[in-house]
Amino acid sequence: MTIMRXKHPLLKLINHSLIDLPAPSNISSWWNFGSLLGICLMIQILTGLFLAMHYTSDTTTAFSSVAHICRDVNYGWLIRYLHANGASMFFICLFIHVGRGIYYGSYTLLETWNIGIILLFTTMATAFVGYVLPWGQMSFWGATVITNLLSAIPYIGNTLVEWIWGGFSVDKATLTRFFAFHFILPFIITALVLVHLLFLHETGSNNPSGLNSNSDKIPFHPYYTIKDLLGILLLLMVLMILVLFFPDILGDPDNYTPANPLNTPAHIKPEWYFLFAYAILRSIPNKLGGVLALILSILILAAFPLLNSSKQHSLIYRPITQSLYWIFIANLLVLTWIGGQPVEYPFTTIGQISSVLYFTIIIVLMPMAGMIENKILKLY
């Protein structure tokens, strides 16, 4: 069997990626989230496939078809809630995965990092078009508000919006194409994941110390397969608690009302995992400025390798940058909270302060802290 897995073209590929892969001996549980994201993606594709068998992408029947899935299809409620809450688990793992990358300096692996940013954008696009499909109030108005942002693009904005809508408002054509996008994007994500792994295995994994670990590697199997398995079991446990006890805790009650173009909900807001970006968007009074800030809030991740001023790889021995990092995380949570609040004082002011702080920490304070730490440690 050993010879077989080392010689067979297909098994050789799996062997070099998951079995005989040399891995650093000291990677912590923060490195588990990559495999957890893979499991989340598999759960989403499988549950999504079964949902697509019963869903109809027509404005008159979309809402009813989701109700039909929950009421009449065998374990349809379970599949639907696994898919909805699976998306939340996906984003929790994504944010932790990116946060780990920032903390331990994984952004120095340029190709892997940049493919990761593209993956983040693609996943966000998938989640957005997916949220429109149940055709509830928040689905409809969320789609209307977010697609309308493209009208801020000078000269071609309005034409672009109508082209995406397939008409003069969010309607049947929009729903049908969003369903098509939602179906195809996870497979594009899967392809990108393989590219992400390809680039990662070119350089090898980073590790908590930030030092070169080539002299101290261990095989991925059995050490990290068993470790990943524990992570997967914990993830599934949390997901099942969510699905079976609190299936609607992360959703919006407005989405249980069928879409009505004549009745606007009091507070239009996206799913919780977009709230931080939504808060940044709302904190700028100008439409185009808001859209640019929204895109930059994610695209700023690409600037991390450029803004890195420290001679050390990881934040583990950098107390000043470490403090800034945790302030940044706290600020991100504040933005998430603000995104779900109505547009009124004091929320708007808090949102504006947090948005400025979000960009200031990344662009100004962290590079400065890196330079100060270099000076203190005499690392010129």
Curated annotation (Swiss-Prot):
A molecular-function term among this protein's GO annotations: metal ion binding
Chain positions recorded as heme b b562 binding sites: 83, 182
GO BP annotations listed: mitochondrial electron transport, ubiquinol to cytochrome c
Predominant location category: mitochondrion
Family annotation (Pfam families): Cytochrom_B_C, Cytochrome_B
Domain of life according to the entry: Eukaryota
Matching CDD domains: cytochrome_b_C, Cytochrome_b_N
Cofactor binding notes: Binds 2 heme b groups non-covalently.
Membrane topology of this protein: Multi-pass membrane protein
UniProt KW Ion transport keyword: no
Binding sites annotated in the UniProt record for a ubiquinone: 201
Residue spans crossing the bilayer: 33-53, 77-98, 113-133, 178-198, 226-246, 288-308, 320-340, 347-367
Residues that hold heme b b566 according to the record: 97, 196
Cofactor(s) this protein cannot do without: heme b
GO cellular component: mitochondrial inner membrane; respiratory chain complex III
SUPFAM superfamilies: a domain/subunit of cytochrome bc1 complex (Ubiquinol-cytochrome c reductase), Transmembrane di-heme cytochromes
InterPro entries: Cyt_b/b6_C, Cyt_b/b6_C_sf, Cyt_b/b6_N, Cytb/b6-like_sf, Cytochrome_b, Cytochrome_b_C_euk/bac, Cytochrome_b_N_euk/bac, Di-haem_cyt_TM
UniProt-annotated location(s): Mitochondrion inner membrane
UniProt keywords, alphabetically: Electron transport, Heme, Iron, Membrane, Metal-binding, Mitochondrion, Mitochondrion inner membrane, Respiratory chain, Transmembrane, Transmembrane helix, Transport, Ubiquinone
Quaternary structure note: The cytochrome bc1 complex contains 11 subunits: 3 respiratory subunits (MT-CYB, CYC1 and UQCRFS1), 2 core proteins (UQCRC1 and UQCRC2) and 6 low-molecular weight proteins (UQCRH/QCR6, UQCRB/QCR7, UQCRQ/QCR8, UQCR10/QCR9, UQCR11/QCR10 and a cleavage product of UQCRFS1). This cytochrome bc1 complex then forms a dimer.
Record function comment: Component of the ubiquinol-cytochrome c reductase complex (complex III or cytochrome b-c1 complex) that is part of the mitochondrial respiratory chain. The b-c1 complex mediates electron transfer from ubiquinol to cytochrome c. Contributes to the generation of a proton gradient across the mitochondrial membrane that is then used for ATP synthesis.
PANTHER family per UniProt: CYTOCHROME B (PTHR19271:SF16)
Family listed: Belongs to the cytochrome b family.
Note: Heme 1 (or BL or b562) is low-potential and absorbs at about 562 nm, and heme 2 (or BH or b566) is high-potential and absorbs at about 566 nm.
Protein name: Cytochrome b
